[in-house]
């Protein structure tokens, strides 16, 4: 395992940001941490990258203890932070050259490495322009280039597409997948975009209030609990007849609407409607990771976002 944690915990005065987390990530995996702001995703990445020290528990990255061997951990990883961290007053090439020096990339191959990553993220033509002239997407691509230029075994990506438009987000992920394949890297990313995790990750962990709620491949999670999702509104609310149906895997009631998880809903829809009584409407769709999140947390991820992040929860204590 290239990443391993045992009982990893981070506490602040009034709140537990990460709660006894056990995690194992294999070499070459693209692993996603999925959850709302304040769930503990950034806290976990910060500890694995040795930026924060755990309150208790242990963790190893590339076989190195994050507390006892932080320098070895840092030398073996790359990271793209949630907030921009490139120097606006330098050119793209100068930012990469400075990173080469900091990570001790041999002088003989520095130029080659810079040219390689600039080509990979399609920034060759803008490499000698100041970063303050770059678009948001270009800056993100530059940060990706910087993160992998020293050939890390693990690449940490903390909300790498946060705030970007959908087209730019798609391009960024194309680069990430290509980088992972070309460099044979393990990628650990955080996101609250469900579709990103579903399309990109070999496995995901849903994290909420500092705990891992469930962990598996996206498809396995959907298959285990969802199937199709039937959303309906009864004219006369009465859920007991529906609750007795053996083909209804899960049922959530929210704001007068029922959300039912049913495998092969088209086969059961006619029978289902004989048990619902009169309805205002019914909708059938394929299940998504948002439905998985709803199943395990009782909230949709956008509702969890609206509750506020970590420090908002601290202030409520």
Describe every region a protein language model picked out.
Residues 57-65, 72-73:
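Conserved ABC transporter NBD signature motif
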């Amino acid at each position: 395992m290239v990443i391993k944690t045992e009982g990893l915990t981070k506490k602040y005065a009034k709140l537990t940001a990460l709660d006894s987390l056990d995690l194992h990530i294999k070499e070459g995996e693209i692993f996603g941490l999925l959850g709302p702001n304040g769930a503990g995703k950034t806290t976990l990445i910060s500890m694995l990258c040795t930026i924060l020290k755990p309150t208790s528990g242990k963790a190893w990255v590339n076989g190195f203890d994050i507390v006892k061997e932080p320098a070895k951990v840092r030398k073996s990883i790359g990271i793209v932070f949630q907030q921009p961290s490139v120097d606006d007053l330098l050119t793209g090439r100068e930012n990469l050259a400075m990173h080469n020096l900091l990570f001790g990339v041999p002088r003989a191959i520095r130029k080659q490495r810079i040219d390689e990553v600039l080509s990979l993220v399609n920034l060759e033509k803008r490499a000698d322009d100041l970063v303050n002239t770059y678009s948001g997407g270009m800056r993100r691509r530059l940060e990706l280039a910087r993160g992998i230029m020293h050939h890390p075994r693990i690449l940490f990506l903390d909300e790498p597409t946060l705030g970007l438009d959908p087209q730019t987000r798609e391009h960024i992920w194309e680069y990430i997948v290509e980088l992972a394949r070309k460099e044979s890297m393990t990628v650990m990313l955080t996101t609250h975009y469900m579709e990103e995790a579903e399309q990109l990750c070999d496995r995901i962990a849903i994290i909420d209030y500092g705990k891992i709620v469930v962990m598996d491949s996206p498809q396995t999670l959907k298959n285990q609990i969802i199937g199709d999702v039937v959303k309906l509104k009864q004219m006369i609310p009465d859920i007991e007849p529906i609750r007795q149906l053996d083909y209804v895997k899960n049922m959530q009631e929210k704001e007068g609407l029922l959300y039912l998880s049913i495998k092969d809903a088209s086969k059961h829809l006619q029978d289902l409607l004989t048990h619902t009584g009169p309805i205002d409407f019914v909708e059938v769709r394929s299940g998504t990771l948002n439905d998985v999140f709803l199943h395990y947390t009782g909230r949709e991820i956008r509702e969890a976002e609206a509750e506020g992040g970590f420090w908002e929860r601290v202030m409520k204590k």
